[in-house]
Each structure stands twice: as C-alpha cells, then as structure tokens.
C-alpha cells in the first residue's frame, strides 16, 4: 500500500494465538461479531462487497469492498464508497502461537482539524477492535468495547 505519511491511522497489537486463528477472526463474521460489528452479509472474500452492521448504533451499515486477501498475511478493503478509504490488516507470525496484527487506514481527507479528528477516531476505533479481539481469542471474554464506547444512554435526546 502507498501510504501518505500525513493522512493515515494505525493500530497494532500482539495476540497470543496462532496466525491462522487470528486471521480467521477477521474474515469470519461468526467470530468477528464477538468483538466488533454485530452482523455481516457474508464472510470476507476477495472481490466481494460485504455489508457490516453495528446494531448498537441504530443499524449503522458500512459496505466494504474486499480488494485482496492473502491467507494468514493480509486483508485489504475499501471502506464505504470512498475509493481512497483503504484499510489494511497485516498479520505477522511471531512463532510460539503469537501473532502481531497491524491495521492501517489510509485515505483520511479534509482540513487539518478534520483530518486530526479522523486520525484520532480511527486509531481509537481500531485499537478497541484489537483489544476486543485479544480478550476474546486469548480469554474467551466479550468486552463489548465497541458498543460501550458510545453508550445509548449518552446519545438519547
């Protein structure tokens, strides 16, 4: 991926599970729904457009286009309709059932203050996703980090 060093967000985490298990957690919605979104139209497959739904946010839906999948190495998606909004997962096998996952989001645009807010929000969001993944895969605990970031009680008028 060609990253513009001024307009991307990144989060990374060590997950103490084999790379195949960590990779599967991101392509298989039966697992991903335990730590991120609540529904998906199907499993990630290269060339397909998939709907991800966050029911806790009023059924907020994002359509992602899967640009490439390299088993146990990388996933690249286009996030929504913006062709520049690209998210990439990189999986590194550290041996001894340890996987280092890096998520990079490129395509942040706008004025400087808008870009700073997007970088902050995307970095926070993917950090919560990785922390939720870690808790789920390593300890079989669903922390509900994504849902609890914006509790409905704080958003109701």
Q: What is each model feature region?
A:
Residues 8-10, 59-64, 84-88:
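Short, surface-exposed coil-to-beta transition loops
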Residues 12-16, 53, 65, 90:
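Generic structural detector for well-ordered beta-strands
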Residues 39-81:
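Glycine-rich portal/gate segments that line the openings of hydrophobic small-molecule binding cavities
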Residues 135-157:
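Short, highly charged C-terminal tails/helix-capping segments
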Residues 19-20, 67-72, 91-100:
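A short, structured loop/turn motif at beta-sheet edges
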Residues 22-26, 32, 50, 66, ...:
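Hydrophobic pocket/interface hotspot
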Residues 1-41, 156-157:
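Hydrophobic ligand-binding cavity/cleft-lining segments
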Residues 81-128, 146:
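Beta-strand/loop substructures that line and gate deep hydrophobic ligand-binding cavities in soluble
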